[in-house]
UniProtKB/Swiss-Prot annotation:
Quaternary data: Heptamer of 7 subunits arranged in a ring. Interacts with the chaperonin GroEL.
One GO CC term on file: cytoplasm
PROSITE patterns: CHAPERONINS_CPN10
SMART domains: Cpn10
Biological process terms in GO annotation: chaperone cofactor-dependent protein refolding
GO MF annotations, alphabetized: ATP binding; metal ion binding; protein folding chaperone; protein-folding chaperone binding; unfolded protein binding
Pfam families, per the entry: Cpn10
CDD domains recorded: cpn10
Taxonomic source organism: Parvibaculum lavamentivorans (strain DS-1 / DSM 13023 / NCIMB 13966)
Phylogenetic lineage: Bacteria, Pseudomonadati, Pseudomonadota, Alphaproteobacteria, Hyphomicrobiales
Record-given protein name: Co-chaperonin GroES
Keyword Nucleotide-binding belongs to the record: no
């Protein structure tokens, strides 16, 4: 990807959630909500604090994150649908999600 976010911006790729319920019912595409989980694909250098010093971001490339339903701006970069959002729009990082993904590969 040839995109570098500025300041405290984060680029996130949505991660599709299960299209089947625990009971085995398949949810059609028209009834599914947009996923609120994603994988961080790029991060900015950070925001400037009150003292003018750069404050690095807590998230890093590869982190699996949860964000609000209406968070971010949808963009298309290199033909891929991505979200650009501020780090403050991210609610949290799913610990161990990235390592499980690598172990499965």
């Amino acid at each position: 990807m040839k995109f570098r976010p500025l300041h405290d911006r984060v680029v996130v790729r949505r991660v599709e959630e299960e299209s089947k319920t625990a009971g085995g019912i398949i949810i059609p595409d028209s009834a599914q909500e947009k996923p609120s989980q994603g994988e961080v694909v790029a991060v900015g250098p950070g925001a400037r604090g009150d003292d003018g010093k750069l404050v690095a971001l807590d998230v890093k490339v590869g982190d699996r994150v949860i964000f609000g339903k209406w968070s971010g701006t949808e963009v298309k970069i290199d033909g891929e649908e991505l979200l650009i959002m501020k780090e403050s729009d991210i609610m949290g990082v799913l610990e161990g999600a990235a390592s499980k993904k690598k172990a499965a590969a």
